[in-house]
């Protein structure tokens, strides 16, 4: 017996992509943005199909992602930002609400939302995850978005 498998690919994921980007910790976030753009273009997405929307920080990303999803113009949203732990509970609130809000947007509107918001304990970890030792999480989020766009199309075609 053969099990039927439906999955997305990276090659059949043409579409329009919104990158919702938090400006806070921009020294890290800009590397995430570049990684995402490079990955999308390398997989055949035209730069004219990309829109970058900048917000103050990670906490504001879900609201803007919601507005973007509501408009129905984009096949996927890529959320990019960086929340670095400090000495107060602020980190937990921002990271948790950003994560929860983005999941809610995806479920509410049926639009893939790729999570490329770093939630790290130190600046060193942020730097590692934005293009050095631990890869580029912006590029990984872009790959996730590509795959999800393709998967959603496959599911709708069935």
From Swiss-Prot:
Keyword Transferase: yes
Pfam families: DMRL_synthase
Active site residues of this protein: 90
UniProt entry tagged with the keyword Transferase: yes
Pathway info: Cofactor biosynthesis; riboflavin biosynthesis; riboflavin from 2-hydroxy-3-oxobutyl phosphate and 5-amino-6-(D-ribitylamino)uracil: step 1/2
Domain of life: Bacteria
Annotated (2S)-2-hydroxy-3-oxobutyl phosphate binding sites: 87-88, 129
A GO molecular-function descriptor: 6,7-dimethyl-8-ribityllumazine synthase activity
Annotated family: Belongs to the DMRL synthase family.
Primary role: Catalyzes the formation of 6,7-dimethyl-8-ribityllumazine by condensation of 5-amino-6-(D-ribitylamino)uracil with 3,4-dihydroxy-2-butanone 4-phosphate. This is the penultimate step in the biosynthesis of riboflavin.
Subunit-structure text: Forms an icosahedral capsid composed of 60 subunits, arranged as a dodecamer of pentamers.
PANTHER family: 6,7-DIMETHYL-8-RIBITYLLUMAZINE SYNTHASE, 6,7-DIMETHYL-8-RIBITYLLUMAZINE SYNTHASE DMRL SYNTHASE LUMAZINE SYNTHASE
Protein name: 6,7-dimethyl-8-ribityllumazine synthase
Origin species: Azotobacter vinelandii (strain DJ / ATCC BAA-1303)
């Amino acid at each position: 017996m053969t099990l039927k498998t439906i999955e997305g690919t990276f090659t059949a994921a043409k579409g329009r992509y919104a990158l919702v980007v938090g400006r806070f910790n921009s020294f890290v976030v800009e590397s995430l943005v570049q990684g995402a753009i490079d990955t999308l273009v390398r997989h055949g997405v035209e730069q004219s199909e990309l829109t970058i929307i900048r917000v103050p920080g990670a906490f504001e990303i879900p609201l803007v992602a919601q507005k973007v999803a509501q408009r129905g113009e984009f096949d996927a949203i890529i959320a990019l930002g960086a929340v670095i732990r400090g000495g107060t509970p602020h980190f937990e609130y921002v990271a948790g609400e950003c994560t929860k809000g983005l999941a809610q947007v995806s479920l509410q509107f049926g639009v893939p939302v790729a999570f490329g918001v770093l939630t790290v304990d130190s600046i060193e970890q942020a730097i590692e995850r934005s293009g050095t030792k631990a890869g580029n999480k912006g590029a990984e989020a872009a790959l996730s978005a590509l795959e999800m766009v393709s998967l959603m199309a496959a599911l709708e075609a069935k």
